[in-house]
Amino acid sequence: SHPLENIKFYYVDIPNFYKKIFKGFMYSGRLNVWNRRVLPLAKKICADQKIDVIHQITPIEFRAIGDYGKIANIKFVCGPLGGGESLPNGLKDYAKGHEIIEVVRSGINRWYRFKLRITGKLNRCDYIMFANKETQEFLVGGGAELNCPYELVFDNGLRPDELVNWTEKEKVNEELQCK
């Protein structure tokens, strides 16, 4: 049990203009505007309150990482990050009539990956969690290296080594059916 004491909430809004522009698959733009507005407040809070760790929990969106790693004397944990996966072949029929959105999203993903590498934003993280292997490979693969530890975590909270492989699961199901 961890008693919650002295919790403070700070509300930071963004202008409605950005809310109207950044909708749907462009939502990460809204988060990036918000991150820029929050950074000065986060710096002040960390200095005044002696904060040790900032953990940015995004809506599983690698395109919307704040630059909290620039704040002095704190550890910046980011993730779980997702959004780097491509539309699976088995679901391409569902995208009929909306293919342009997937093409634009793919282009935006590549641009943000390039931007993250150039700015070094990922390397200012002290720890990164990835929500899926595709995003991990998309951001770390291709010769990119991270200067911080990272791991793959799933949205169900299980680590890959905690998952039962399919054949083991089938065996358990068969045993249960026999009883």
Question: Residue spans of the language-model regions?
Answer:
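Short, intrinsically disordered, charge-balanced linker/junction segments flanking boundaries
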Residues: 1, 64, 168-179
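N-terminal subdomain of nucleotide-sugar transferases
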Residues: 1-7, 47-49, 68, 72-74, ...
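A conserved catalytic-core segment of Leloir-type glycosyltransferases
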Residues: 1-40
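Donor nucleotide-sugar binding/catalytic pocket of nucleotide-sugar-dependent glycosyltransferases
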Residues: 8-11, 78, 108-173
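Acceptor-binding helix/loop patch of EC 2.4 sugar-transfer enzymes
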Residues: 14-26, 78-116, 160, 165
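A polyampholytic, Gly/Pro-enriched intrinsically disordered region
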Residues: 27-34, 97-107, 171-178
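An aromatic- and histidine-rich active-site surface loop
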Residues: 31-39, 53-93
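Short, well-structured alpha-helical segments in soluble
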Residues: 37-49
